[in-house]
Each structure stands twice: as C-alpha cells, then as structure tokens.
Amino acid sequence: DRSPSRGLGDVYKRQLLLTHAPEYGKNGILVMGDVAVTPVPDASQLAQIAVCTARTAQAVAGIDPKVALLSFSTKGSAKHEVVDKVVEALKIAKEMAPDIAIDGELQADAALVPEVGASKAPGSAIAGNANVLVVPSLEVGNISYKLVQRLGHADAVGPILQGIARPVNDLSRGCSVDDIYKMVAIACNQSIGLKSAK
C-alpha cells in the first residue's frame, strides 16, 4: 500500500549516513532529509520533512533526534526569503511535534561542531549536537549526502521513504550488494515497527 500514511500528506526520502567521524551525530550516525523527492519544499513541507526525518531517526536508527534545519544563515546572520522559509518551517515543526528537539536556522558547521555552535548560536540545545539534518531543498540534500558518501567515505543507507502506509524503499542505481542488504534490514525494521504500533 503506497498510499500516504494517516496524518501526512506527502512522501519524503531521507538518507542514513554512517560516517567514520564518531564526534558527529550519534557516534557518527546522521540522518538527512529530504534527499530525493521534493525539489523546493515550502515552509509547511519543510516542517513535515523535519518531523518525518526525526521519527525515522527514532524508528530506524534508535536515535534520540536532535534536528537542525540547515541554511546558509545561523540565527539571522543572513537575510533572504530562503532563510525566512526555514524560520517559518521551524515554527510549524515545533507546533506539529512539540516533543521533538529542533532548532534552526543553522549553518552545517554550527549544527555539527560544538565550539562553532556555541559561538554562532549560544543557548541552542541543538547547535553543535545535531544528529538529524534537514536541508532546505532537494538540490542541497542530494548533493550533500553524495559528497559525504564519496569524499567522507560514509556509508549512505537509503533513501528511506516515509509518509507511506507500508514500508516502501528505493535504491540508487549506483548501489552495491551491501546497500541492498541494509535496505532490506531497514524495511524489515519498518514493518516490525508498524506491527508494534497497532
């Protein structure tokens, strides 16, 4: 059943990144979204992506999500309509899921590096501690995860679909046998999660 799941209007894809940098994310594990579906999300869609990606981090990777809405600006350091969209998405996401730790707008270094986060976004519980990265567009997401995968030698597992009533996932045409194995394991995990939720 590829129909949307209840409460969600759209389908999004996120990438599980297993990096060799344990100082980032949860022991090197990061979840990034949306990397393959929505080219230019509006603020509401970006908020949905943030909430869905956080839920995926919980369900698939066992991560207590610390969500950063990424931008080229940190806490008003730049003014632009794209930044305004991220700020609006943060407000919507906090209303949608007040239980999720989320902040933005944050530059990638402010989201991931504690010293930079403390300098650029003092007082933020997410800055320097993010393990879920929400990018402002598909272009940014797709380029970012592939750069991390290829230049950083990270394992990129996914894309993992969310917002669908049953587990359905996708693989890149450049995937390996190991990638297929990991996606099968994730689909099984998603299926078990659905049965447990009933």
Please provide the spans of the model-predicted regions.
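Short, glycine-/small-residue-rich phosphate/pyrophosphate-handling segment
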Residues: 24-52, 173-197
